[in-house]
Amino acid sequence: MNPVISITLLLSVLQMSRGQRVISLTACLVNQNLRLDCRHENNTNLPIQHEFSLTREKKKHVLSGTLGVPEHTYRSRVNLFSDRFIKVLTLANFTTKDEGDYMCELRVSGQNPTSSNKTINVIRDKLVKCGGISLLVQNTSWLLLLLLSLSFLQATDFISL
């Protein structure tokens, strides 16, 4: 086999295997709603399929996604926001009946399909409230956050530059 073709194939496989790795899955409460943030890599041009599910009492319930069929009971309560590096699921009116293991799964199809997932155990009484500062930290680059912090500290005469 031609070495150039071998290297190209190897790079394609490596890109696909890294293209959708789930980095983190976090949960918090916004009013009475559960918010799940599924952060992931995206180093592929292929479509990334996704699925959010809940496992409760050893039974899997698909909430949203393109891999499985979402259960009818959750369709009216679920809202999904999808961007290049994050998928955010909001489950309205979260109660103790919705507690369990939540999973975010991503899959890239193609010649060598790959998948990646993360699971988080969600208990209502242990959930933190989603806050403005945590949103800023999650959605702003660290450099910008550092610059904003330095400006604030300088304005309050906490530091002098």
From Swiss-Prot:
Glycans are attached at residues 42, 93, 117. The modification Pyrrolidone carboxylic acid is found at residue 20. Residues 20-126 form the Ig-like V-type domain. A lipid is attached at residue 130 (GPI-anchor amidated cysteine). Disulfide bonds join 28-130, 38-104. It comes from the Eukaryota. GO terms for cellular component: apical plasma membrane; axolemma; cell surface; cytosol; dendrite; dendrite membrane; external side of plasma membrane; glutamatergic synapse. This is Thy-1 membrane glycoprotein. It comes from Rattus norvegicus. It is found in: Cell membrane. The gene is Thy1. Residues 131-161 form a propeptide. The modification Phosphoserine is found at residue 82. The keyword Oxidoreductase does not apply. SUPFAM superfamilies: Immunoglobulin (SSF48726). May play a role in cell-cell or cell-ligand interactions during synaptogenesis and other events in the brain. Abundant in lymphoid tissues. The keyword Phosphoprotein applies. It is a lipid-anchor; GPI-anchor. Coiled coil: none annotated. Glycosylation is tissue specific. Sialylation of N-glycans at Asn-93 in brain and at Asn-42, Asn-93 and Asn-117 in thymus.
